[in-house]
């Protein structure tokens, strides 16, 4: 696979190969194996987000009336590879230098291998041993030329990441039928998981010779950093499935893990599950229109550990070989494993010859002792602390509707609708946590958890208003923001839905998938920067004749009245001014559009950069033709099909930037409800050919 992305000189290549097989060693012993290998390479993966080396950052600050060809050539004459042309601002790099010189090459090799042996001990017992190895080698580089905004003397970084995970299992299974229609399938086993991450980085902060990206070209001592994470989890588990005449089913499971990443006194944790289902149509006489009526209920627990080295003080290596520094995250020698408990009840009903099927589920989930690194006051000497954060609840509904409206000899229309609604709530926080627990912060928006709220609550400064909702304006004619941050909305939507329609006529199949969500909020730093610079459509008000808020400075009557100087365009911000007696009067103070929008859309003002995240997408359209056996009879093919497809074709939303289905990256975590320097979601179209021999 070769992918050329929407930006010049970016993209990647990928090659995947898989081999699998089974060997019957004897009548009782068989061996299965499977190996897959993936190679992925890119000469340049683009930098994204709100950073000076991303094209989105350049486009935010670039003047819209500037011809990009003015940035050619990239370098000042006589100072090639040393001084890039930055004709309009030193804060943004030359876009051609960003795309063709500030490179991020990468090459990755990944393998997943599995081998298992199955031994039939008797008619009722089987024994299996299995081992699976997942291994990755990732080689990355960063090239930054001289006169880079962040690295004026150039920069080169070489990073090698080795990662593997080895899982070894033993499993004894039992299966039998007894009494009258009772079947039992049971198993008991053990697993040992070992993983290692070894990340080695070397960097040259400053280059002797321009354009030569080698560690030997470092202008000073090479910055060295190595991170090694080792982890082991030992487990024992059991499962049992009991069925009575295919009418009544009972499933039970249990597992105990011992994790090396947890404190010694808490490193063992047990979790289990129980589920039952009953087919009422097999027990009772139902109307002939009902083909199946199934009720189910389940209770399940899932345990979870964390990353290594959070239980004691471990010194961190610095950029210089042989030196260490104090950790920035406060360790915890007494935290507990995370446990999630889930309850679910559901119903599956199929009617009219399976032409109308409904599946409904209600679930309730409670997670306690979530392990996270919570921000803390830097004056303590630490920026974060490892804690058990408290208890979080999720509850909701899921509904799936499948129906066939039309069916004839040559034509079939199948429709599937999915709808889900989830409500998140924080029930308690750690005793050591503040009343408002900061989860993440990007731009002016803070994701804050508090009891009674959600883990997606967005907080920030808002416009200060009167009790009847009018915006308060100060004496200079600019809107006033609140003194403290306040709750502005939740990132999570009210509900999500999808609708798939498939139209099949003879050998042709047309599939159309729509999906979307209703509700949720998203804060955009891109909108803030565009608004401050007058590059969004919303800032045309007050700048063009005929638009709201527009006041012409050429109106001599206003000038003679001393309200504003001659020339230019002005805005009188809608709102009221507070009087000394506590009353309010309408604002009459004109300000320039540049000053007004610079204050109104500032990054810290979360309310004015917050939007509804509802959307509807045409997720996929696919037209496929399947060749008949008769058409293939003179070929070596057993089956063949060809399809035209398009993915992410359209998005209907009121969100003014690109795609509301996004999040911002903060320290390796995706923060919902926040956008920072994103690029447009790509639309893809292609042809797919599938053949079998």
Regions found by a protein language model. Give the residues of each.
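Alpha-helical scaffolds flanking conserved acidic
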Residues: 12-14, 292-293, 638-643
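Short glycine/threonine-rich loop-to-helix capping motif typified by GTGT followed
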Residues: 264-268
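Transmembrane beta-barrel architecture of outer membranes
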Residues: 12-18, 235, 269-273, 684
């Amino acid at each position: 696979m070769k992918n050329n992305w929407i930006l010049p000189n970016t993209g990647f290549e990928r090659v995947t190969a898989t081999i699998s097989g089974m060997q019957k060693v004897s009548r009782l012993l068989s061996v299965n194996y499977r190996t897959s290998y993936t190679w992925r390479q890119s000469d340049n993966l683009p930098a994204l987000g709100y950073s000076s080396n991303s094209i989105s950052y350049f486009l935010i600050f670039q003047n819209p009336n500037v011809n990009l060809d003015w940035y050619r050539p990239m370098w000042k004459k006589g100072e090639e590879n040393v001084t890039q042309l930055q004709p309009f601002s030193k804060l943004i790099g030359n876009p051609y230098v960003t795309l063709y010189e500030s490179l991020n090459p990468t090459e990755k090799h990944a393998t997943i291998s599995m081998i298992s042996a199955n031994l039939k001990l008797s008619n009722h017992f089987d024994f299996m041993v299995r081992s699976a190895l997942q291994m990755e080698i990732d080689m990355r580089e960063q090239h930054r030329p001289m006169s880079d905004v962040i690295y004026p003397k150039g920069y080169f970084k070489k990073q090698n990441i080795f990662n593997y995970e080895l899982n070894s299992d033993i499993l004894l299974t039992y299966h039998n039928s007894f009494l009258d229609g009772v079947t039992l399938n049971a198993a008991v086993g053990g697993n040992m998981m070992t993983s290692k991450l070894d990340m080695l980085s070397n960097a040259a902060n400053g280059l002797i010779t321009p354009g030569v990206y080698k560690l030997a070209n470092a202008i000073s001592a090479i910055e060295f950093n190595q991170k090694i994470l080792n982890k082991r989890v030992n487990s024992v588990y059991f499962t049992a499935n009991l069925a009575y005449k295919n009418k009544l089913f009972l499933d039970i499971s249990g597992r105990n893990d011992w994790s090396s990443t947890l404190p010694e006194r808490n490193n063992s944790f047990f979790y289990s599950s129980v589920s039952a289902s009953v087919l009422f149509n097999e027990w009772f006489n139902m109307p002939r229109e009902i083909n199946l009526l199934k009720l189910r209920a389940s209770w399940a627990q899932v345990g979870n550990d964390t990353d290594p080295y959070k239980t004691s003080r471990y010194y961190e290596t610095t950029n210089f070989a042989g030196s260490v520094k104090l950790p920035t995250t406060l360790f915890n020698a007494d935290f507990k494993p995370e446990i999630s408990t889930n309850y679910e009840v559901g119903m599956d009903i199929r009617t009219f010859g399976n032409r109308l099927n409904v599946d409904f589920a209600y679930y309730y989930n409670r997670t306690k002792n979530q392990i996270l690194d919570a921000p803390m006051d830097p004056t303590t000497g630490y920026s974060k602390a490892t804690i058990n954060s408290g208890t979080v609840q999720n509850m909701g509904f899921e509904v799936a509707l499948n129906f066939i409206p039309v069916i004839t000899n040559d034509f079939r229309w199948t429709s599937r609708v999915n709808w889900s609604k989830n409500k998140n709530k924080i029930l308690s926080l750690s005793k050591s946590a503040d009343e408002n627990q900061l989860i993440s912060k990007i731009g002016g928006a803070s994701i804050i958890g508090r009891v009674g709220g959600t883990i997606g609550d967005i907080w920030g400064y808002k416009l200060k208003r009167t009790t009847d909702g009018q915006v308060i304006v100060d004496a200079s004619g600019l809107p006033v923001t609140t003194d403290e941050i306040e709750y502005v909305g939740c990132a999570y939507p009210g509900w999500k839905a999808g609708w798939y329609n498939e139209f099949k006529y003879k050998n042709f199949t047309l599939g159309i998938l729509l999906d979307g969500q209703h509700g949720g909020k998203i804060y955009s730093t891109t909108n803030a920067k565009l608004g401050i610079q007058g590059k969004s459509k919303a800032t045309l008000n007050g700048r063009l004749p005929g638009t709201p808020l527009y006041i012409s400075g050429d109106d001599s009557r206003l000038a003679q009245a001393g309200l504003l100087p001659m020339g230019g365009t002005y805005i009188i911000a809608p709102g009221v001014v507070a009087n000394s007696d506590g009353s309010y009067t309408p604002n009459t103070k004109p300000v320039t559009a540049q000053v007004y929008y610079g204050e109104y859309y500032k990054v810290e003002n979360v309310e004015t950069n917050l939007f509804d995240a509802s959307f509807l997408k045409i997720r996929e359209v696919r037209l496929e033709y399947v060749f008949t056996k008769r058409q293939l009879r003179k070929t070596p093919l057993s089956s063949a099909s060809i399809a035209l497809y398009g993915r992410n074709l359209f998005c209907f939303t009121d969100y003014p930037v690109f795609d509301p289905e996004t999040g911002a990256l903060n320290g390796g975590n995706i923060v919902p409800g926040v956008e920072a320097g994103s690029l447009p979601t790509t639309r893809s179209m292609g042809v797919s050919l599938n053949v079998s021999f």
